[in-house]
């Protein structure tokens, strides 16, 4: 009934099961509710809410920042999965959220594309908000650049969080992440998203580069360590150095210095491709 607020005693309330009360049960507030023209807002744009129940068009939710509990219509919120996958918002609302005062460079979200049904868009905060279309292959793999394919969206986010690789910047934190309170318990080191990787390896001896021979085992892995211990960006930097310092017979010759490794989510392939192509949404 117009702008009237939802009754606090709904006739039918569907509590969410324990299996639903997970990471996906968050809502991002897209606009102040209720409107300031009617009464002081209970929930403000940019707040993240935990879902209590779903009533078909209305949500009963509690704010993660203020602790206030109330009802809010579905048109005023977007559903959030994994902290960065937003469902139910368009390009304009995505830009509004990414341009909130506390949002930093590199903040991002993935959302359903408005212009291409069945595809997704990656929206990133930089000097301005940039949008990149995410394509889906027939085998359900994803890519932004055709030379880099990923088995799932999580792998795509992980890769571009390590290296920009053609994007406007590296992905840093999901949009509105600052509105989620810090956990009270100590997270596991292997699951903490902000834990830096520390390598306990011998210092690399650059003099060994000149002794590398084409086709030798050392040329394949001059560090003689597991490649998985090094980030993609570090390995690419080493490859670039080798291409600049190696002689004509080196496996890393000069003509390869502008090329990069293909990353495929769960696998890394040693095939070389030309510079990436990106399609802005």
UniProtKB/Swiss-Prot annotation:
Residues 190-281 are annotated as: SLA C-terminal. The keyword Phosphoprotein applies. Residues 1-20 are annotated as: Disordered. Residues 22-82 form the SH3 domain. Residues 84-175 form the SH2 domain. Residues 7-20 have a biased composition (Low complexity). CDD domains: SH2_SLAP, SH3_SLAP. The C-terminal domain is essential for the homodimerization and the interaction with CBL. While the interaction with CBL is apparently mediated via the hydrophobic region of this domain, the highly charged region is apparently required for the homodimerization. Homodimer. Interacts with phosphorylated CBL, SYK and LAT. Homodimerization and interaction with phosphorylated CBL occurs via its C-terminal domain. Interacts with PDGFRB and EPHA2. Interacts with phosphorylated proteins ZAP70; CD3Z; VAV1 and LCP2 via its SH2 domain. SLA deficient mice show a strong up-regulation of TCR and CD5 at the CD4(+) CD8(+) stage, and an enhanced positive selection in T-cells. This is Src-like-adapter. It comes from Mus musculus (Mouse). The lineage of its organism: Eukaryota, Metazoa, Chordata, Craniata, Vertebrata.
């Amino acid at each position: 009934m117009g702008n009237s607020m939802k009754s606090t005693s709904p006739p039918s309330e569907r509590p969410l099961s324990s299996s639903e009360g997970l990471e996906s049960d968050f809502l991002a507030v897209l606009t102040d509710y209720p409107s300031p023209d009617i009464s002081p807002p209970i929930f403000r744009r940019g707040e993240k809410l935990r879902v209590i129940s779903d009533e078909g068009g209305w949500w009963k939710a509690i704010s993660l920042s203020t602790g206030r509990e109330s009802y809010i219509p579905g048109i005023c919120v977007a559903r959030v999965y994994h902290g960065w996958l937003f469902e139910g918002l368009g390009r304009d609302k995505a830009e509004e959220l990414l341009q909130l005062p506390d949002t930093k460079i590199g903040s991002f979200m993935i959302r359903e594309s408005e212009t291409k049904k069945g595809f997704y868009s990656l929206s990133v905060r930089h000097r301005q908000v940039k949008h990149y279309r995410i394509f889906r292959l027939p085998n359900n793999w994803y890519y932004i650049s055709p030379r880099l394919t990923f088995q799932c969206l999580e792998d795509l986010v992980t890769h571009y969080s390590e290296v920009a690789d053609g994007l406007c910047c590296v992905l840093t934190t999901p949009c509105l992440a600052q509105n989620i309170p810090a956990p009270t318990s100590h997270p596991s080191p292997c699951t903490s998203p902000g834990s830096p990787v520390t390598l306990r390896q011998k210092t690399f001896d650059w003099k060994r580069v000149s002794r590398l021979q084409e086709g030798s085992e050392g040329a394949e892995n001059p560090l003689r360590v597991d490649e998985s211990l090094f980030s993609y960006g570090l390995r690419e930097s080493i490859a670039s150095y080798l291409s600049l310092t190696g002689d004509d017979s080196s496996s890393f010759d000069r003509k390869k210095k502008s090329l990069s490794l293909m990353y495929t989510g769960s696998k890394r392939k040693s095939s070389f491709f030309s510079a990436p192509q990106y399609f802005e949404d």
